[in-house]
Amino acid sequence: QRQMCIRDRHIGSGGSLTGPMMVLKALTSYQTPHIQIDFIGNADSSDLQAKLRKLDPATTLVVIASKTFSTQETILNAETMKKWMLERLGPSSLSKHFVAITGNKNRANSFGIVDENIFEIWEWVGGRFSLWSAVGLTIVLGIGSENFKEFLRGARAIDEHFQNTAPEMNLPLILGMLEIWYTSILNFGSRAIIPYDHRLQNFVSYIQQLEMESNGKSVDKLGNKMTKKTAAVVWGAEGTNAQHLSLIHI
């Protein structure tokens, strides 16, 4: 069995971690045979060390996703993986077993990653949307290129729906207006996401990060202090596990 340890963390917000994690869990039934993907995001080394004990360096690919290639947590875990690999396979392992997804090619080169193993992302790509960019390499490894293309076609379909559909039938617009109504007008401060499919268990953390980073602002574009709430606290749990959170029923 071919094992791949995917080390994936977005600068500051975790977008390139939560996105691929959510998608790959949701599309488990499309998983590429003989490829095992592990996500390493926390600076606490216990998770990484536990995974390293199970890995064969000869069959391990390390994908480092960082827009600036300077995030402390990212580089800390990347350096640990690098040391582990060099001790077992020597200097040549860097060109064979390490891939970077970044907007800072020079820093990736300085780390030891060769040009042909660097997938560049544009400056305007935010981490919370990065799963549609080169960060999606992790998803390609997990479900295969054809399934990933189908995934992109689905994303394009909803983009075109948003751009071309009249307001009264426009799903993203309606959901956005409802969010403003409940959060900024009715002043609700909490929103629970409860997916009733086990494969969507990571959807909660993805939406939490997506919305609370995008809309969680205390000032407007001109620097003026906001007088209304801009976002609710997003939380939740998987399916019937959430029924034991008694407060949600009150």
What are these regions (language model features)?
Residues 2-6, 250:
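Short, small-residue-biased leader/transition segments that mark boundaries at the very start
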Residues 14-18, 22, 41, 50-52, ...:
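Conserved adenosyl
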Residues 19, 23, 48, 64-67, ...:
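Extended, hydrophobic alpha-helical segments in both membrane/secreted and soluble proteins
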Residues 8-22, 129-136:
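Conserved phosphate/anionic-ligand binding catalytic regions in large, soluble enzymes, centered on
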Residues 23-24, 29-61:
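Glycine-rich oxoanion-binding loops at beta->alpha junctions
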Residues 7-12, 62-68, 190-197:
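Short glycine-rich or small-residue beta-strand-to-loop segments that form or flank ligand, phosphate
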